[in-house]
Amino acid sequence: MNKFDVVVVGGGHAGCEAAAAAARIGVKVALITLKPENLGEMPCNPAIGGRGKGHIVKEVDALDGLIGYIADQAGIHYKMLNHTKGPAVWGPRAQIDRALYKSAMYSTIMNYPNLTTIFASVEDIKVIANKVTAVIVNGKEIYCQKVILTTGTFLSGVIHRGKEQIKAGRLGENASYGLSNTLSELGLRLGRLKTGTPPRIDSRTIDYSKLEEQPGDLIPTPFSEITKKVLVPQIKCYITRTNEITHKIIKENLHLSAMYSGQIQGTGPRYCPSIEDKIIRFSHNASHQIFLEPEGLNSNTIYPNGISTSLPSDVQENMIRTIEGLENCKIIAYGYAIEYDYVDPRQLKHSLEVKSVGGLYLAGQINGTTGYEEAAGQGIMAGINAALAVKKQDPFILDRTDAYIGVMIDDLTNGIDEPYRMFTSRSEYRLSIRADNADQRLTPKAIDLGCVSQLRQEVFQKKLSKLNTLRDYVQSLTITPKQLQNCGYQISQNGIARTAFSLLGLPNFGINIVKDIYPELNRYDNNLLLLLTYESKYHVYLERQKEDIELFKQEETYQIPQDLNYDQIPSLSIEVREKLKQYQPETIRAAKHINGVTPSAIMAIIIFLKTKYLNSSITDKK
């Protein structure tokens, strides 16, 4: 076979989601990756989800993606983060058994309809008249209409450990230099980023009696709406800390760290700093927490989350043995930093297609993100849009009001200067785009696109029907303050009757109290009552937020034609014109985010567009 509609390069989290999404829409897809064992690889921490990240997993699942469902087949320690705060910022997270995850992903991808897997290296991309036509594998052309690059850290990757430098995409695997050259030759701006990983420890050499236990949630909350119950055995994690002796060893050897010797030029992740960064940036802290995370039920490998490092191996040995519980530990693999090329994501459309090269899409770390979840979110969007383009359909765009995926892509296309990680704080509309309502927000859109399985559609529609029925019922149940008092519950004596729905959201009430007042609610699914509780809690705020969303939508609908000649707008300065030509914003809102583009320049563009297009096509979606 040497002809496909879509070719996906790379079999990590972005690549698997991209390939599966395009295949679900019904086009012919090839996924090209080096080795079978690369499918679904988790090269860094053995965990999925977290604050903001867990929201993306739920959103990918709502679009019938893979990451959540596969994680539920491999999750060994579930924990809902931020549970003491409001439901909008709860972060579902799970430790993952690497072997189980890879096995489940391999089985899924290898048996996916419309998807062919090729184990090889892509040497080059063929572009004719600024459109992709093929990829080059083993000197031969594989023809295609669309290419999705999901190369992770493999673009000109270099591993650093002390003064040691190894050309690799990750430890033990060759980097890709040809594709970096190809992207440069296509005129794309590349940058350099860095990430890191800690040493791995043999669990049999740890003194657990000195450590703090960290149990998971008593009842695991699955990521996927398809998962009825998590069946994988659950285990504990453990916590220890660095100390002043640890910090002393690190400080004395900072000159040997690849990060601090000037050897690494790439920018590292602000929110996942190396242990060297931590003791310098947070020198006032006497210690730093380390989470000891098992890599699997049948694995002796422990991932010490919190001490990624690029120090030499001997320094890592000395450092780690100063930590309580790890005094006699055996290191299985040493930590390292990895530096790699990424493409400035301002060169992408919101569909993740490269503006200057038709049919070329980018997803994952190649766009400057960090994390499996961010990669999966981009992968599924790139896959959907590549397939829609093959079918000559409009792109599928999620904006900031729709999803965290929309927030991420909007942030990326407006430009980044460090590895991008998702947090709930990045969203202005987080009350509306919660993890618990991801399917209600996105699954109907996915059904319309045709990228949802029959099973997913049936599960969703059944749940939605039950939820709507229950919502109508609890809104029909009313009770006066006097009646509540007779039931033993105090509320403001203003004579206004409350519905059971409104009671669910009151601070001193909740499901159990409302069930006590209305025992007939005991026959309904408790999970559905929980969803209505969240709706009730945020009801007033959501009504207010609707106005903000309407304003956002108005601004977002002002499209800027790609062929607009900015030289025809006389009031724009030379600097503003140059920046607008460079970044080619698709909307007025995107233009506002370009550094140096002034409010007066924005107004000049709007006036020009209204005059030129007579108030019509500038509000038409492309």
Curated annotation (Swiss-Prot):
Highest taxon listed in the record's lineage: Bacteria
Alphabetized Gene3D superfamilies for the sequence: FAD/NAD(P)-binding domain, GidA associated domain, C-terminal subdomain
BP GO terms, sorted: tRNA methylation; tRNA wobble uridine modification
Annotated positions binding NAD(+): 268-282
Chief site of localization: cytoplasm
Record SMART domains: GIDA_assoc_3
Record keywords, A-Z: Cytoplasm, FAD, Flavoprotein, NAD, tRNA processing
SUPFAM superfamilies reported in the protein's UniProt record: FAD/NAD(P)-binding domain
Location in the cell: Cytoplasm
Co-factor requirement: FAD
Family: Belongs to the MnmG family.
Quaternary context: Homodimer. Heterotetramer of two MnmE and two MnmG subunits.
UniProt-recorded name of the protein: tRNA uridine 5-carboxymethylaminomethyl modification enzyme MnmG
Organism: Orientia tsutsugamushi (strain Boryong) (Rickettsia tsutsugamushi)
Lineage of origin: Bacteria, Pseudomonadati, Pseudomonadota, Alphaproteobacteria, Rickettsiales
